[in-house]
């Protein structure tokens, strides 16, 4: 990695992505998040890195992208490190009011992320989300486990599909959930 020399590298064994994640430390004791991906994912990871820069520019509390490139292990990105606790693993230790406050804050953060326009080449939302709804409904119908009055959910979705028509296209996070959030030592949600 051209711009950084790290003296420690500790694997972070969490999450579902193929990326290998590490907490790395430089000679001055500064910590960073290092993500390493297979070289075949270069284009996708470069797009993700650039998008992270757009999100960070909105003031969203997050690991800030610092460097992107390739090295002998694949594609890497270096981001700022956030000291704190895993939100998913610790939410149950918080009061109901604290949980509500963090949930409300998560909604405000997502609203900021949705200010980013979708790429021009992305297909129309109505087509995309109707196909996605069709797929999810089909999966539910083929699943042996059913919700009591589950058809009411399907009926609701089908009755409101018209709302997808003419919607503005914005960036969709796609993986925005408590498992990808931290509560910093400063008590902020990241």
Protein language model features and the residues they cover:
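ATP-binding pocket architecture of kinase catalytic cores
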Residues: 11-124, 148, 166
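Conserved protein kinase catalytic/activation segment
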Residues: 180-190
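Short, well-ordered coil/turn elements that cap or connect secondary structure elements
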Residues: 3-4, 57-60, 186
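Charge-rich, low-complexity amphipathic helices
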Residues: 77-78, 135-136, 179
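Acidic active-site catalytic centers that drive phospho-/nucleotidyl reactions
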Residues: 48, 173-175, 180
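Conserved N-terminal boundary motif of the eukaryotic protein kinase catalytic domain
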Residues: 3-12
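An alpha-helical support segment within catalytic cores of ATP-dependent transferases
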Residues: 1-3, 115-174, 184-185
